Structure formats: C-alpha cells, structure tokens
Amino acid sequence: MELAEIVMNPVRQRIFQYFLLHETGTVKEIRKALPDIPGASLYRHIKILADSSILMVVDENRIRGTVESVYQIK
C-alpha cells in the first residue's frame, strides 16, 4: 500500500489527528476519543499505520495477562 493511500483513508486521518493532539495513546484511549469507530476497525487501521512505520510502539503495559501497546507517531 502506498503512503498516500494509507494516509488518505478518513479513519486513519482521524487516528492521526488524535496523535497530533495527544503525544501517545493506547487503543483503549483512542476508542474513548473516537467512539463512532468500531473496535475491530480501529485495531485494523492502527495495525496498518504501525506496519507502515507511521506509528510506533513506545511502551507496553501488562494488564491481566495481555499486553496493551502504547503508540506514538514516528
């Protein structure tokens, strides 16, 4: 996927705007800020942004046996 195609998606633009206002964020925090985006879609779009090196994981929190990633714009 080309960079222009990645960043022109409306959902990914909203996620990107979230990170312009907040230095870091978890999926849970982003879901709270963007409640109209379904959770599965949010996870998929964050994965696309992370795989394309637009977002990076800056920390990981262990919560009840699972790992919650903290993301930041690269």
Identify what each model region corresponds to.
Residues 46-47:
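Short, hydrophobic-biased segments on the C-terminal half of alpha helices
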Residues 29-33:
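A short acidic, leucine-rich amphipathic alpha-helix
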Residues 18-22:
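Short amphipathic alpha-helical elements of helix-turn-helix/winged-helix folds
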Residues 37-39:
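Short coil turns linking two alpha-helices in DNA-binding domains
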Residues 53:
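Glycine-centered, phosphate/nucleic-acid-interacting loop/turn motifs that mediate DNA/RNA or nucleotide
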Residues 13-17:
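Pre-recognition alpha-helix immediately N-terminal to the DNA-recognition helix
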Residues 5-11, 26, 56, 60-74:
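Short, cationic-aromatic polyanion-contact patches
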